C-alpha cells in the first residue's frame, strides 16, 4: 500500500491510497465515520479530473484535530477489530 498526500490543511486531508479497492476503502470510510473527531469521510475511485479509473482518493475532514491523526486512529481501529475477529475465530 502506497500513500500520497494530495492536499492537507489543518482539518482536511486528501490522500491517494494506491493498490486498494472498494472493499478496503468502504471499511476504512466506515470506521472513520464512527470516529469522534471526524466531520466527514469519503473516497472516490474515479476523480473527475482523472479521465478514468485511478487509485482511490480518500478525503477526511476533522472537527478540530489533525486529519492525519484521525486517519491513524481509524487504521488502529481496523487493526483492533480484525484482531478481535481473528481471536474469536480461533476460539470457535
UniProtKB/Swiss-Prot annotation:
One of its GO terms (molecular function) is protein dimerization activity. Belongs to the archaeal Rpo11/eukaryotic RPB11/RPC19 RNA polymerase subunit family. Disulfide bonds: none annotated. Keywords: Cytoplasm, DNA-directed RNA polymerase, Nucleotidyltransferase, Transcription, Transferase. Part of the RNA polymerase complex. It holds the Pfam family RNA_pol_L_2. This is DNA-directed RNA polymerase subunit Rpo11. InterPro entries: RBP11-like (IPR036603), RBP11-like_dimer (IPR009025), RNA_pol_Rpb11_13-16kDa_CS (IPR008193), Rpo11-like (IPR022905). One of its GO terms (cellular component) is cytoplasm. Its main location: cytoplasm. Its EC number is 2.7.7.6. It is found in: Cytoplasm. DNA-dependent RNA polymerase (RNAP) catalyzes the transcription of DNA into RNA using the four ribonucleoside triphosphates as substrates. One of its GO terms (biological process) is DNA-templated transcription. The gene is rpo11. It catalyses: RNA(n) + a ribonucleoside 5'-triphosphate = RNA(n+1) + diphosphate.
